């Protein structure tokens, strides 16, 4: 589950006429606060019964997998061969596909949705088309242009908008690692998807604390935690799941058992340590395809097990090789 969008994106919804202040969480019971890496595939990992859909989607991406059945087996194998060449060229170019090169390819594939969302944002924010996104451009494209001292004079709840603007600017400054007030594509990616970047971890934690710490003591108390998940209606009996969340707070969130969450504990909650899914899948594909057991894959070994990596009209393939190389 992805980290909730920046408040600037919520503001876009507000300005389009949405009623009321939106919750900073997406998903049931506030679980949108927690960033889990998206699964490589929703399909079962069922190689034992000849179902390689999971591997196809992990190797090529879920959306790409929808295109697989358009190709003949011959076309599929030919295009897989081209992917193999590209994987090796992206690495050391020694004619073999190493575990690291295979992992890098799978990770790159799984990040495509992020690259696509950043490309769309880039087209919106780079208003002067100079190949960079300045803070002024992003601010004006998102909030509208205001003269100094007149910010949000024409909207209701101007103070809330000002806080949102300040919060977005703070996040932008952290993402802007060289401090020139101009975001490169990588820096804009960090701004829009901070959960993907180690140097943005502290800002994700700070924003979560600001959202939940109602008494401003620097901690998240259990009642503040629950208030983010559930608002009781007059006379309403508290649902059983709320008590379960209290137990979750006590048993798993509050690591030092002092009855509250500090910044480190908030970070452990919203940005939990993640399994390296691309590495797990790369190891699996290597194990299943490395016939001479030398710890690397030749092109012949991959093509010899081609139906695990990709498919054909009977299974799948995708648009990876119908896209321009710089899109992949």
UniProtKB/Swiss-Prot annotation:
Q: How does it assemble?
A: Interacts with PCSK6 (immature form including the propeptide); probably involved in the maturation and the secretion of PCSK6.
For this protein, the record's SUPFAM superfamilies field holds: EF-hand (SSF47473)
* Prevents secretion from ER (motif): residue ranges: 325-328
Which residues make up the binding site for Ca(2+) 4? Answer: 213, 215, 217, 219, 224
- Cite the CDD domains for this sequence: EFh_CREC_RCN3
- Tell me a GO cellular component: endoplasmic reticulum
Residues where Ca(2+) 1 binds? 92, 94, 96, 101
Function (record text): Probable molecular chaperone assisting protein biosynthesis and transport in the endoplasmic reticulum. Required for the proper biosynthesis and transport of pulmonary surfactant-associated protein A/SP-A, pulmonary surfactant-associated protein D/SP-D and the lipid transporter ABCA3. By regulating both the proper expression and the degradation through the endoplasmic reticulum-associated protein degradation pathway of these proteins plays a crucial role in pulmonary surfactant homeostasis. Has an anti-fibrotic activity by negatively regulating the secretion of type I and type III collagens.
- Sugar attachment sites are 140, 262
Task: Give the encoding gene's name.
Answer: RCN3
PROSITE patterns attached here?
A: EF_HAND_1 (PS00018), EF_HAND_2 (PS50222), ER_TARGET (PS00014)
Task: Enumerate the UniProt keywords alphabetically.
Answer: Calcium, Chaperone, Endoplasmic reticulum, Glycoprotein, Metal-binding, Repeat, Signal
Q: What is the protein name given in its UniProt record? A: Reticulocalbin-3
Source species? Bos taurus
The record ties this protein, via Pfam families, to: EF-hand_5, EF-hand_7
Q: Which GO terms are recorded in the biological process aspect for this UniProt protein?
A: collagen biosynthetic process; ERAD pathway; lung epithelium development; phospholipid homeostasis; positive regulation of peptidase activity; protein secretion; protein transport; surfactant homeostasis
Annotated positions binding Ca(2+) 3: 176, 178, 180, 182, 187
What family does this chain come from, according to its entry?
Answer: Belongs to the CREC family.
Q: Quick one: which residues bind Ca(2+) 5?
A: 254, 256, 258, 260, 265
Quote the record's binding site residues for Ca(2+) 6: 290, 292, 294, 296, 301
